Structure formats: C-alpha cells, structure tokens
Amino acid sequence: MKVLIVGSGGREHAIAYSVAKSDKVDKIYCTPGNAGIAEFAECAPIGAMEFDKIVAFAKEKEIDLVIVGMDDPLVGGLVDELEAAGIRTFGPRKNAAILEGSKAFSKDLMKKYNIPTAAYENFTDPAKAIEYLKTEAKFPIVLKADGLALGKGVLICKDLEEAEEGVKTIMLDKKFGTAGNEMVIEEFMTGREVSVLSFVDGNTIKTMTSAQDHKRAGDGDTGLNTGGMGTFSPSPFYTEEVDEFCKKYVYQPTVDAMKAEGRPFKGVIFFGLMLTADGPKVLEYNARFGDPEAQVVLPRMKNDIIDVVEACIDGTLDQIDLQFEDNAAVCVVLASDGYPVKYDKGLPISGLDEFGKHEGYYCFHAGTKFDGDQIVTNGGRVLGVTAKGKDLKEARANAYTACLLYTSDAADEAR
C-alpha cells in the first residue's frame, strides 16, 4: 500500500511514525513534509493548500490512501477533491470540517443538541458586540475569532476596556484575517482543561486516551498563548466518571448531531474539554489530531493505525478494539527563542541521531528543514521531544533527559 500524508508539523511526523510501523504499508509520501518526516517518507515540495497539485501527485504516484493531518486543507475541502478523483482519503469532508472551521457553527450545534458548553453569543457586527459587552457581559469574558487562527484566535479579557480592544483586534483590525468576520463572545469557564482525541466513522465514535497540553510560551505557565508548548497523556483528571459522562452527553451526541445536520463526520474529532464545577463542558472541537497531542497519544496506541483509519472510511469502526499501552508519555516542545512573536530561522540543529539509540524516546520534527545535509530550524515550534514512562513522573523525567540530547542556538523549552 502507498500512503500520502498531507502536512508538515510534529503531528504529521507522529502520524508518519505510526504509519511506518504498519505491515500493510510499502511506501510513504508526504506533502510538503519536513526534515524529520523524511526519515519515513519521500517528501514532495507541494503546499498543503495546493489541492490540484496534491490530487495530481496522488494520481501520479498511484496513492492508495491519503491522510490529511492539517486543519486548513480539511476546512478548505481537500478531502472532497481527493474523493472526487477516486482517491481514498482519511479526514472529514468540507461540510463536516466546519465543526472546527466555524466556532459560531459549533456553538450553535451544541446549543441545538444540548451538548454542554459555555453560554455565548455570536456577532457579525462589531458595534453590536461592543453594545453586548457594555450591557450584558460578566467579566472576565472570552472572545473567539470564528475561523481558523493557528490556535491563537482566542482572547481572555478581564474588563470592558480589554474586551473593546479585543473586538477591535479581531473584527476591525482583522488580526486573524477573515477568521474575524464573525466572533463568538463566550462565558469564561474555570477548571481543568483536558483533550480527548477520537476516531469517528460517521456513526461510531471510539475515543483514544486523554491528554493535557501546555499553551503558555514561558516557564511556570507564563507568557503568551501558543499552539502548544508541551503535553502529557493520560490526564490524571480525566476519571472514569468524567469519561462516562462525556460518552453519554458529549461524544456520541456530537457525532449524531453532525449526522442529523446532513454533515456525517469521518476522521478525527478532538474534544477540548473544561472540567468545571458543574461538570465537563466543551471548549472547542478540532477536526483532526491535536498538535502536540498526537505526539503523546499515537506512540501509546497498540493498534495498526491503517486498520483504524480504513475502518473509519468504510464505516466499520464498531469492529475495532482500540487499545493503548498502560503507561504515560510526555512531550516537551523545543521552540525558537522569541516564539510566538519574532524568532530566527535557519539555525543548525545537532544531536538528533542520538534519539534512535534510546528505547521510548521520540523526536518529532515540527519547524525543521534541510539546508544541504544540515537540519536547520524553520519555524516557531521546532521539535517535540517525547518520552514514555511507567507513570507521568517518570515520563516527564525521561522527556527532559531526552531534551539534553539536542543542541541548537534556537532552543527554548516549556517546563
């Protein structure tokens, strides 16, 4: 079997690692890929949004299965284009990927189908949003750009002044582009944040293990929000009681709601949950594997990923017994100094050969590329250093030990 993976981050590297373990796979390609993915796949310099080129490449290479890792091409309809060309593809079609592509849509869906989430209002007029903030809002309050914004389109505002500035940033200054044409104003929730990834075949949903990520750029949970500076799995706060509640009131109801709306979802749904004093509530949906959550979840999965992916496409997920190792994993993101604001690229990285010598250590590349034979930095989040352990404490110690194998002038890590 020939498999094509679409994307270039640590998530896609983790997917490529899992695909490479399958006995069913003879050859892996990746567009555009990165320096780490190149260990497992032949990378082609085609951007994830160059749909025509991706379809042509898949036909030329006689690809049997495409796995789309990134949110932008999913929301843009890459799966539809590949399927129209007769190519088997894992991921939601455009009309289902809206679950992530529009926060206003997802909030309205949850409201309609009684899926627990924070109270909210949607706005397309900034003047009406500000009027609402002045007359109805309780602070702190959350402002969310409706569309995709690289995980950075959420502002937590402590008072009216900050909220008015936030409306200006999102809707008038268009800091997040067209993602800010519509905005969600949402009640601020407190509690533990947990991520749960799931496989979905349109009817059946099978959850993977839980994870928790660390979004702040600085040590000690300080600094700006990022796409994710580290993560661990499983979450000690995701208890059996929470799992039972979410299966009954969140997971299956979401799949059923999308089907009822004529938008059957096949692929991965990422549930961002807040464990509040009133019970679990949905913070957000993503229509793909999380990044860096995939880097701690996929190494713990016992199943052949190809079996699971094909079951999702074929609607036979109910026949899969999804299993995970009884251990823990921690991922530490090594980011360029200055991320997420301003940072240099092209800085050399060394020490990567050492990872293959250690059982249970993984180095997933995010922002890397080749400069001749040298691997150099090519983004804000550079590497995801992952390690397993019998429990979270051991896994964390192993992950930081693994970080010592890596050297670069760019290093900045989450603690």
Residue ranges and their predicted role:
Residues T231-P234, V333, R381-G389:
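Short, well-ordered beta-strand elements within core beta-sheets of diverse protein domains
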Residues L4-I5, E100-E182, Q212, P236-Q252:
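Active-site nucleotide/adenylate-binding loops and adjacent lid/helix of ATP-dependent enzymes
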Residues Y406-R415:
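Single conserved hydrophobic/aromatic residue that forms the stacking wall/gate
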Residues M1-K94:
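ATP-binding N-terminal substructure of ATP-dependent carboxylate-amine bond-forming enzymes
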Residues C246-I269, N286-H358, D371:
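Active-site "cap" helix and flanking loop/linker of ATP-utilizing ligase/carboxylase catalytic domains
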Residues C157-A294:
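Internal nucleotide-binding/catalytic subdomain
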